[in-house]
């Protein structure tokens, strides 16, 4: 048996307005309407997930039309957010869309193989549910107070859910997994002061 000591670290999530939202929303929704679709249906003793339209299986294909449209402003946006955390050089791992019709849900889950997960709320009906996250170690459930056009960034180990869609309108998100590869040099010089 192992001895395990657990110590608290502060974690975070960030919520920011995507400045290109108004210019891109209708174009991205149209491109997604024409995109490949692999509905997600997971049903076992743990999950009863159903996502009406999705291309998660194609997440590593960056040549899809909506991805090529979305990536340049997304990378600029993530570069700006990274500055707040002293991190630079975004490495995108996967990107995909999900569309939820009434009754669809994506149960509690996390993301592997990346440092961070992002959710861009492309089309969020007013009566559609908000993303919820579990606070590590306390198991407190937090409902994220976002609005359409926002981007949520969470560490990829954070357990989160998109609860059952109660709206009769389609909810559309673009999700992405990524890393920040480096530390800004100015920050690194500051951090080096703590080295012996």
Q: What are these language model-derived features?
A:
Residues 14-20, 25, 49, 53-54, ...:
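Residue-level detector of solvent-exposed, low-hydrophobicity positions
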Residues 89-158, 163, 170-172, 180-192:
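Catalytic core of non-heme Fe(II) oxygenases with the double-stranded beta-helix
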Residues 1-87:
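Non-heme Fe(II)/2-oxoglutarate
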Residues 195-196:
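Short, cationic low-complexity segments
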